[in-house]
Amino acid sequence: MRLLFFGPPGAGKGTQAKKVAQEFQIVHISTGDILRDAVSKGTELGKMAKAIMDRGELVSDEIMNSLVKERLEELDSFILDGYPRTLDQAKFLDQATKELQKEIDAAVLIDVSEEEIVKRISNRRVCPNCGKVYNLITLQPKEDEKCDVCGTKLIQRDDDKEEVVRERYKVYKKNTEPVIEYYRKNNKIITIDGAQNVEDVTKELFNILRSFNKQ
């Protein structure tokens, strides 16, 4: 099985991708993994990517595309998480997987509304001392706003503030919507309601992929 995973920040996309990888024994790779792997191996592309990142710049589509293709050459089954992010990357991936005869079977969309994402992320609290993460709705501390482990007052990270979350969601929709539409037109999209609890999302996803795998 060759899968792509999409979903807004806070949808639990990474969690579900890892669960699927484990259940179906597929390699789960993220763009971060691909970059780190190429840099540590010291490949030509890895050296180019490292030089760009060392300057604090973003790795170009061209280099990222080549790195992804290089990694996919080594694998038969895979889950790609965090790629493609743009329509150009999606078109490149289509072409590359056709050449490698490893075409994408499905693109999984963990779909969650903006309001649900805001509710999830803006209610996160973190202990600045020991790093334990809480949620004021789903994983409350025993004592109000205090860490169960060390008693330190919990904080809200800047990234978890409502206005930042809404901006990230807006950027996600703007960049990813055309990519999702591209796969929808090609009948590759599997949409899962990500507003369910984690276990129910996993169960639904496993059931769909099991029947899909038998085809």
Swiss-Prot record:
Any single Gene Ontology cellular-component annotation: cytoplasm
Pathway assigned in UniProt: Purine metabolism; AMP biosynthesis via salvage pathway; AMP from ADP: step 1/1
One Pfam family in the UniProt entry: ADK
Ranges for region NMP: 30-59
Keywords for this protein: ATP-binding, Cytoplasm, Kinase, Metal-binding, Nucleotide biosynthesis, Nucleotide-binding, Transferase, Zinc
Record family assignment: Belongs to the adenylate kinase family.
Subunit structure: Monomer.
Functional note: Catalyzes the reversible transfer of the terminal phosphate group between ATP and AMP. Plays an important role in cellular energy homeostasis and in adenine nucleotide metabolism.
Protein name, entry field: Adenylate kinase
Gene behind this protein: adk
